[in-house]
Amino acid sequence: MTPVRMQHSLAGQTYAVPLIQPDLRREEAVQQMADALQYLQKVSGDIFSRISQQVEQSRSQVQAIGEKVSLAQAKIEKIKGSKKAIKVFSSAKYPAPERLQEYGSIFTGAQDPGLQRRPRHRIQSKHRPLDERALQEKDFPVCVSTKPEPEDDAEEGLGGLPSNISSVSSLLLFNTTENLGKKYVFLDPLAGAVTKTHVMLGAETEEKLFDAPLSISKREQLEQQVPENYFYVPDLGQVPEIDVPSYLPDLPGITNDLMYIADLGPGIAPSAPGTIPELPTFHTEVAEPLKVDLQDGVLTPPPPPPPPPPAPEVLASAPPLPPSTAAPVGQGARQDDSSSSASPSVQGAPREVVDPSGGRATLLESIRQAGGIGKAKLRSMKERKLEKKQQKEQEQVRATSQGGHLMSDLFNKLVMRRKGISGKGPGAGEGPGGAFARVSDSIPPLPPPQQPQAEEDEDDWES
């Protein structure tokens, strides 16, 4: 006889230990007990082996995590005493797989040992004969009360009708929820079942005015509500000012090779009005104005000035004339020339241009009053070049003394690169003038123009 297997197992439960049935023969009961104990031993051995495998797997994971922790601790100990700034780059993604591994039970893939075919045993003994005594042993009397409990199903009626109702049709009221019964149940979904009578209904049917608002009853004035502003208004807030030194030497855990410049980078409130940085002042000369070229937002050094043209020999040799004698001579010459040769360009010119006492006469008069070339305080080109060179060196020294400014370093590097490209660097063997100065020196000066004064005026107007 094979043992009966219980099928009340849960979902995913693999093992099912058989139970020993009652009323078995002695030999049969002993055989089933031995089979059940053997099956239970196999099941317990399989369960504990799977648990030990899971524990070993978890222990290996914990050991790998411990190795990572020890490696990170060793790196921290190595850089703990360093005073250099170290950048730590963290991964942009969380160090985990995109799809987590689903949890699997440790009993997945387990097979029920009871499904294997077991040996069959032949039993010689016979069953015990069933008699009256055996039936009485199996009989268990149970007291059960079969008396039904009385149910209270009596429902309360609606009560009596009013005395003025004479027919059934009077009970039908069109488009109302009122019941003519003296006592009925009014169903309210919010308050529940409420029993009302006609007296209560009569009190409710009286129309009442609503209470007056507080502004009328208590004569209070309503406060005007201020509309809320949902626009974004950036506010820097009150930032505490901390007066600390810029360099703190010999502090543990503090780097000494970092420099922070507050002017670089945008502010925390881009829409707030920012402070305008102070621009450097440039000194200009009277004889030659300094032109600053801007290329892509970077200052470029000014080009070398060309050599001055040679002075005319007539002005250098002739003594300066007084303004009283020079004016009538010039006017007489202009009158003779204008009467002899009248060009169409002069005839079509306006009156201010034809008038000889215009801006040109005042310019010549101011030159004569200044004393001419002999008394003019002019400097040579070598002095100008030396002064410009000294100014550049002072600006470079001032920029390097400030230290750490990004724009000044970039400007100095660009200046040195341009000097190296143009051949004006410190390693070049040429003089301060360079190749351009030597070429300009080799060009002979132009001869002075030998033309009358009237033709000069006509050429000026045509140009």
From Swiss-Prot:
This protein's UniProt keywords: Actin-binding, Cell projection, Cytoplasm, Cytoplasmic vesicle, Cytoskeleton, Endosome, Isopeptide bond, Membrane, Transport, Ubl conjugation
Q: Where is the WH2 domain?
A: 359-381
Which intervals of the chain are annotated as region Required for WASH complex assembly? 1-54
Bias class Basic and acidic residues marks the residues at 380-396
In this chain, the stretch annotated as Disordered covers 295-463
* Crosslinked residue numbers (Glycyl lysine isopeptide (Lys-Gly) (interchain with G-Cter in ubiquitin)): K218
Main localization (coarse)? other
Please describe, based on the UniProt annotation, the reported consequence of changing W461A: No effect on WASH complex assembly
This protein's source sits in the domain of life called Eukaryota
* Record's compositionally biased regions (Gly residues): 422-434
Q: Where is this region: VCA?
A: 347-463
List all Acidic residues biased stretches: 454-463
Q: Which GO terms describe its biological process?
A: Arp2/3 complex-mediated actin nucleation; early endosome to late endosome transport; endocytic recycling; endosomal transport; endosome organization; exocytosis; protein targeting to lysosome; regulation of Arp2/3 complex-mediated actin nucleation
Q: Which GO terms describe its molecular function?
A: actin binding; alpha-tubulin binding; gamma-tubulin binding
Provide ranges: composition bias, Pro residues: 300-312
**UniProt-annotated stretches for the region WHD1:** 1-165
Question: Got a GO cellular component term for this one?
Answer: autophagosome
Q: Where in the cell is it found?
A: Early endosome; Early endosome membrane; Recycling endosome membrane; Cell projection, Lamellipodium
This molecule's function is given as: Acts as a nucleation-promoting factor at the surface of endosomes, where it recruits and activates the Arp2/3 complex to induce actin polymerization, playing a key role in the fission of tubules that serve as transport intermediates during endosome sorting. Involved in endocytic trafficking of EGF. Involved in transferrin receptor recycling. Regulates the trafficking of endosomal alpha5beta1 integrin to the plasma membrane and involved in invasive cell migration.
Q: Which family does it belong to?
A: Belongs to the WASH1 family.
Question: Domains: what does the record tell us?
Answer: The VCA (verprolin, cofilin, acidic) domain promotes actin polymerization by the Arp2/3 complex in vitro.
- Share any extra remarks: WASH genes duplicated to multiple chromosomal ends during primate evolution, with highest copy number reached in humans, whose WASH repertoires probably vary extensively among individuals. It is therefore difficult to determine which gene is functional or not. The telomeric region of chromosome 9p is paralogous to the pericentromeric regions of chromosome 9 as well as to 2q. Paralogous regions contain 7 transcriptional units. Duplicated WASH genes are also present in the Xq/Yq pseudoautosomal region, as well as on chromosome 1 and 15. The chromosome 16 copy seems to be a pseudogene.
Q: How does it assemble?
A: Component of the WASH core complex also described as WASH regulatory complex (SHRC) composed of WASH (WASHC1, WASH2P or WASH3P), WASHC2 (WASHC2A or WASHC2C), WASHC3, WASHC4 and WASHC5. The WASH core complex associates with the F-actin-capping protein dimer (formed by CAPZA1, CAPZA2 or CAPZA3 and CAPZB) in a transient or substoichiometric manner which was initially described as WASH complex. Interacts (via WHD1 region) with WASHC2C; the interaction is direct. Interacts with alpha-tubulin. Interacts with BECN1; WASHC1 and AMBRA1 can competitively interact with BECN1.
Q: Which PANTHER family match?
A: CXYORF1 (PTHR23331), WAS PROTEIN FAMILY HOMOLOG 2-RELATED (PTHR23331:SF5)
Quote the protein name from its UniProt record.
Putative WAS protein family homolog 3
**What is the gene name?**
WASH3P
